[in-house]
Amino acid sequence: GHMVNAIAQIDEFVNLGANSIETDVSFDKNANPEYTYHGIPCDCGRTCTKWEYFNTFLGGLRKATTPGDSKYHEKLVLVVFDLKTGSLYDNQAYDAGTKLAKSLLQNYWNKGNNGGRAYIVLSIPNLDHYKLITGFKETLTKEEHPELMDKVGYDFSGNDDIGDVAKAYKKAGVTGHVWQSDGITNCLLRGLDRVRKAVANRDSSNGYINKVYYWTVDKRASTRDALDAGVDGIMTNYPDVIADVLSESAYTAKFRIATYDDNPWETFKN
């Protein structure tokens, strides 16, 4: 589910069939994650201005992903944080990673004590901000919870050349847990050329990509095209549309909605 920035929207999107949500994270000038907020402009047909304070949103997300909580959704297994680091200087990326890790540790993971269980993808728009990953990782180690990195994956969302993305991961010391996004706002059309390159990298013996997702897909025809290209995930404003297509006979044998027992960091071999 795309652009889920208010706590009330978590229920809304999961009830429509989403097993994953994407949330925008904006930063203040000191690189603190401040709001879950997208702002104007955003996808056609959506309200761009829903928001929460980041730490408040994490509290709601924790409840939605903690078994036994009254707000728990068993189906919600993955959260993509779309990190709006464009407002930061390049040299603040490490600090942003540090502060993000501290916020998640406190407000989502409950300091490692029965916190939220969802897998997290840190989605970064700029390859030059790879040190955000370093800062995040080193902070969890320093705070004595390196095991939480098992729950964390990565994405560079700028539609960069696949080879350049590989170099950024090398600099960040990342060797797994890689999701590769490709896409554009639903107001515009985008072909599947780069998606096919990403899928080819995923399926090659020496690729760096574990999963490929495509955004923002709102129509049945474009959903089918993306599935035919071999994507692992689809980001949408209308989870019920994707669920409908997945129930068509052409797709039921090959695709299903992932559950918590599926490993989001493992490349699917069919």
UniProtKB/Swiss-Prot annotation:
A GO biological process held by the record: lipid catabolic process
Catalytic reaction annotation: an N-(acyl)-sphingosylphosphocholine = an N-(acyl)-sphingosyl-1,3-cyclic phosphate + choline; an N-(acyl)-sphingosylphosphoethanolamine = an N-(acyl)-sphingosyl-1,3-cyclic phosphate + ethanolamine; a 1-acyl-sn-glycero-3-phosphocholine = a 1-acyl-sn-glycero-2,3-cyclic phosphate + choline; a 1-acyl-sn-glycero-3-phosphoethanolamine = a 1-acyl-sn-glycero-2,3-cyclic phosphate + ethanolamine
Binding-site list for Mg(2+): E22, D24, D82
Any GO MF annotation of the entry: toxin activity
Example of a GO cellular component annotation carried by this entry: extracellular region
Predominant location: secreted
SS bond list: C42-C48, C44-C187
Distribution of this protein across tissues and organs: Expressed by the venom gland.
Entry's cofactor comment: Binds 1 Mg(2+) ion per subunit.
Name of the featured protein: Dermonecrotic toxin LsaSicTox-alphaIB1av
Organism: Loxosceles sabina
